[in-house]
């Protein structure tokens, strides 16, 4: 039996720097969560769609730490994200979706259905709801992404429906405020809990983690030297993966948070969203 099944995107990411340098690497929130959870000791399955352009060595790297029976390889291109860094520090991130459409209808292997916990990584909210309808009676957690900011604001009723049907939500501080419309992070946590989430886990970067289940608990970030931070983009996914590795195996909350913080610290020291090196 799997401890955790992660559903969402795996991508090909190209970083484009102001001096013209281009670096291509594997990405995708689902792979970030899944690889982190696997390295934290969980038995993990991944459900995603990739195209025939996805490098075989990347797929082999995934298969070395988790089950890839749920990875669909389809004619066409894998979702491709460009991270264009500008000299003023701003970043543009155009996305080509490729075969990564209609994720709410993606086949889930029968042997995955008895997994202890399912995690839905950021996909359009209507697709998240389709998956929740298919996973009725299962223990489900969910994550969000500011890419869907307009949909979140326009469809707050849809978000409430999603949150009401999951055990845990994993927004970062910015996402929590955006989703709820609150101006204070603790108010945002109360709102998300009021919508029905049993546990609200808000990552706050160097300020650590805020957890709310009717009462607040705050956990400091683990120390890391500024010069050790290579790429901050994968920290949230790595945290969620580590946390879920503990949660899916019945570990105490404090241990789940510690596992998440440890995995986040490690992924900050390397480029990319994955916790494994390819």
Swiss-Prot record:
Described function: Involved in nucleoside degradation. Phosphorylates cytidine to CMP. Can also act on deoxycytidine and uridine, but is most active with cytidine. ATP is the most preferred phosphate donor, but it can also use GTP, CTP or UTP.
The protein's Enzyme Commission number: 2.7.1.213
UniProt name for this protein: Cytidine kinase
Domain of life (superkingdom): Archaea
pH dependence, record text: High levels of activity within a broad pH range of 5.0-9.0.
Disulfide bridge positions per record: none
GO annotation (BP), single: fructose metabolic process
Keywords: ATP-binding, Kinase, Magnesium, Nucleotide-binding, Transferase
Residues annotated to bind ATP: 203-208
Record flagged with keyword Repeat: no
Catalytic site: 237 (proton acceptor)
Temperature and activity: Optimum temperature is 90 degrees Celsius.
UniProt cross-references to Pfam families, sorted A to Z: PfkB
Sequence similarity: Belongs to the carbohydrate kinase PfkB family.
The reaction(s) this protein catalyses: cytidine + ATP = CMP + ADP + H(+)
Free-text remark on how the cofactor is bound: Mg(2+) is the preferred cation, followed by Mn(2+) and Co(2+).
Cofactor requirement: Mg(2+)
One Gene Ontology term of the molecular function aspect: ATP binding
